[in-house]
């Protein structure tokens, strides 16, 4: 990989039957950017990421990384690309019955020989690398627990540790915080940002929330109806841009930016009445 490997999406579309999920997308992402892709449900965000990783093939157009076309890869070259382009999912995609350490070690499968994978044995160095990844995500204490016993936030951090084991050049995160509470969402986004800043790994993450995208991403891409309707730095995501991305509700009113917030809000306590309690149903 060159020192300035670029992910390029050229005229990419994806159709499912008569429905067009993604339409004529053209994006160039230099190495080291942290990109937030925002938009309403059904805007085409997940389909875009799945095409980049080649979980879904484009109906037309091409995808390049570091000058090589990845949209035509098959067999071993495709597996190498999916190793280099790690995917993090909303629903974690862990093996619940396996312990956390083994789930993280599975990120090494595409680095190993077929025989080693069939034997199911990992080296001491690989185990040490997996533990280090868990320590970095502050969940090493869960290493021997079944992954299915962890909270959602912990499971997502395990998924990030597994992605790190792939030694990726690109990380794609498909709605990584959609099922998490605000505090766990912050931990997950802090982790992705740390990886981006420390390793210089390109991170592209789908997000529903504007405040999260503005806080963590140095570039925001807005999608609506399968098309890119905004592409720029967070400071350019103004009211008009938000309207283009999120549109209006069924009554025609503009979508309020407040409803896309993940901020933790605390409701003020209501002082209890000092007077005697009255029965709700007198006579009972």
UniProtKB/Swiss-Prot annotation:
Any one GO molecular-function label of the UniProt entry: ATP hydrolysis activity
Q: Where does ATP bind?
A: 39-46
Per UniProt, the keywords (alphabetical) are: ATP-binding, Cell inner membrane, Cell membrane, Membrane, Nucleotide-binding, Phosphonate transport, Translocase, Transport
Q: What is its EC number?
A: 7.3.2.2
Q: Does the keyword Mitochondrion apply?
A: no
- Domain ABC transporter, by residue range, is 7-250
| Catalytic activity, as annotated | phosphonate(out) + ATP + H2O = phosphonate(in) + ADP + phosphate + H(+)
Q: Does the keyword Cell membrane apply?
A: yes
Q: Where in the cell is it found?
A: Cell inner membrane
An example GO CC term for this entry is:
plasma membrane
Tree of life domain: Bacteria
- Which top EC class applies here? translocase
Q: How does it assemble?
A: The complex is composed of two ATP-binding proteins (PhnC), two transmembrane proteins (PhnE) and a solute-binding protein (PhnD).
Family membership: Belongs to the ABC transporter superfamily. Phosphonates importer (TC 3.A.1.9.1) family.
Q: What protein name is recorded for this chain?
A: Phosphonates import ATP-binding protein PhnC
What species is this protein from? Answer: Mesorhizobium japonicum (strain LMG 29417 / CECT 9101 / MAFF 303099) (Mesorhizobium loti (strain MAFF 303099))
Recorded name of the encoding gene: phnC
């Amino acid at each position: 990989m060159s020192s300035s490997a670029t992910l390029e999406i050229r005229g990419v579309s994806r159709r499912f039957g008569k429905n067009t999920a993604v339409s004529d997308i053209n994006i160039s992402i230099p190495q080291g950017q942290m990109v937030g892709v925002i938009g309403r449900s059904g805007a085409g965000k997940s389909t875009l990421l799945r095409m980049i990783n080649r979980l879904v093939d484009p109906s037309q157009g091409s995808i390049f990384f570091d000058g090589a076309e990845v949209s035509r890869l098959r067999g071993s070259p495709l597996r190498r690309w999916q190793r280099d382009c790690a995917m993090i999912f909303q629903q974690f995609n862990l093996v619940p019955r396996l312990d956390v350490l083994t789930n993280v070690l599975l990120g090494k499968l595409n680095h190993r020989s077929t025989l080693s994978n069939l034997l199911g044995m990992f080296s001491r160095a690989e185990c040490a690398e997996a533990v280090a990844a868990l320590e970095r995500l502050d969940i090493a204490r869960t290493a021997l627990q079944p992954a299915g016993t962890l909270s959602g936030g912990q499971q997502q951090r395990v998924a990030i540790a597994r992605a790190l084991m792939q030694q990726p050049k690109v990380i794609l995160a498909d709605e990584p915080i959609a099922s998490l509470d605000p505090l766990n969402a912050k931990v997950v986004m802090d982790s992705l940002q740390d990886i981006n800043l420390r390793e210089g790994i390109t991170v592209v993450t789908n997000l529903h929330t504007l405040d999260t995208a503005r806080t963590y991403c140095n570039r925001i891409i807005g999608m609506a109806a399968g098309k890119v309707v905004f592409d720029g730095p967070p400071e350019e995501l103004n009211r008009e841009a938000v309207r283009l991305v999120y549109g209006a509700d069924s009554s025609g009113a503009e979508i309020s930016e407040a409803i896309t917030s993940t901020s933790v809000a605390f409701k003020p306590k209501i002082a209890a009445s000092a007077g005697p309690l009255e029965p709700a149903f007198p006579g009972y």
